[in-house]
UniProtKB/Swiss-Prot annotation:
It comes from Acidithiobacillus ferrooxidans (strain ATCC 23270 / DSM 14882 / CIP 104768 / NCIMB 8455). Its EC number is 3.6.5.-. Pfam families: GTP1_OBG, MMR_HSR1. Coiled coil: none annotated. The gene is obg. This is GTPase Obg. Mg(2+) binds at S173, T193. Disulfide bonds: none annotated.
Length: 374
């Protein structure tokens, strides 16, 4: 299944039913008066968050949604049946924007959360409503009100406690495989990861946190190089970032310079994300002898003047991973909550959302999305 995280849809609520024009006609009651009932309301449209969904791919095949219209009123003061409400299932973590005004309508963060996005049309009054002392036999009625219509842009942002950052082949996917049950693709070439992966890291029987792995960044990503910053938005809800770096890159590059380059890309994309707590994780310690690996680790930390926590690990062998996981678990309760994306101003320019969406939907990433990861 392809991973789709932005779509456009059109929604319309149901129109209200028309009121009825009717008069009571029974034996021995020749002038029974008006008894036309009101029309029923139309159906409203709701978005409902569902935890079993993890992509917006279904909306690529159906873009238009309409709720049922209300039924017309009838004689004997009978009100028309209301139209059925329409509930559209979306993944937990979906942001809903008005596509015309770019206004944020809601953020569906919790299982079962409902958001009204198109209110139903009101049912029209029947002629009974217009009866008065001066109008004993009214023949006027009211048509049902029109339902609301709007174009929406749905944007999925994954829910995770911790996010992984790093260059391609830094070992992010290997780390998430080592500490969770997630099984992202791992291979010895750049951009093996083409879409985000989530893994649940279980520390104890009832203690766990969620780790997010996104495709690797490269210098120039904020300007579209590589896979660009398309997936950085999925780290917007995290409380802690782990900056993974290969301590012995095959291209001979300086690990400290690689980290500085990505720090600049992160700041260019979102100052809010760049200011988030970030730990340094130096990976692939198994490639060097023990003392040499420790010396290289200290050299990198010194060159960066790194003051936050730093860890030396080997995701391939598992060395140091347990200590890293335990430190994260201890730190998470004291970390501030992630910035509310509904209040954040710097997560990319919403004015060019249409262009970004068209470019994204034109891509053909034939990658299987791991449904069983979380």
């Amino acid at each position: 299944m392809k991973f789709i995280d932005e779509v456009r849809i059109h929604v319309a609520s149901g129109n209200g039913g028309h009121g009825a024009v009717s008069f009571r006609r029974e034996k021995f009651i020749p002038f029974g008066g008006p008894d036309g009932g009101d029309g029923g309301r139309g159906g409203s449209v709701y978005l409902v968050a569902q935890a079993s969904l993890n992509t917006l791919i279904d909306f690529r095949y159906q873009r238009r949604y309409r709720a049922e219209n209300g039924h017309g009123g009838a004689g004997r003061q009978m009100t028309g049946r209301a139209g059925h409400d329409l509930e559209i299932k979306v993944p937990v973590g979906t942001l809903v924007y008005d596509d015309d005004t770019h206004e944020l309508l809601g953020d569906l963060r919790f299982e079962g959360e409902r958001l009204l996005i198109a209110r139903s049309g009101r049912g029209g009054h029947g002629n009974l409503f217009y009866k008065s002392s001066t109008n004993r036999a009214p023949r006027q009625f009211e048509k049902g009100g029109a339902g609301e219509e709007r174009d929406l842009r749905l944007e999925l942002r994954l829910l995770a406690d911790v996010g992984l950052l790093g260059l391609p082949n830094a070992g992010k996917s290997t780390l998430i495989r080592a500490v969770s049950a997630a099984r992202p693709k791992v291979a010895d070439y750049p951009f093996t990861t083409l879409y985000p992966n989530l893994g649940v890291v279980r520390v104890a029987a009832h203690e766990s946190f969620v780790l997010a792995d996104i495709p690797g960044l490269i210098p120039g990503a904020s300007e579209g190089a590589g896979l660009g910053t398309r997936f950085l938005k999925h780290l917007s809800r995290t409380r802690l970032l782990l900056h993974l770096v290969d301590m012995a890159p095959v291209d001979g590059s300086d690990p400290a310079m690689n980290i500085r380059a990505l720090e600049m890309e992160l700041a260019a994309y979102s100052p809010t994300l760049a200011a988030r707590p970030r730990w340094l994780v130096v990976n692939k310690s198994d490639l060097l002898p023990g003392e040499e690996a420790e010396a290289r680790f200290q050299q990198i930390c010194t060159a960066l003047q790194w003051e936050s926590p730093a860890f030396l690990i080997s995701a391939a062998s598992g060395a140091g991973c347990e200590a890293l996981v335990y430190a994260i678990w201890q730190a998470l309760p004291d970390l501030p909550p992630a910035a509310d994306p509904t209040q954040t101003e710097d997560w990319g320019d919403e004015s060019d959302a249409g262009e970004r969406l068209e470019n994204w939907e034109g891509d053909d990433l034939d990658a299987d999305w791991e449904e069983e990861q979380v």
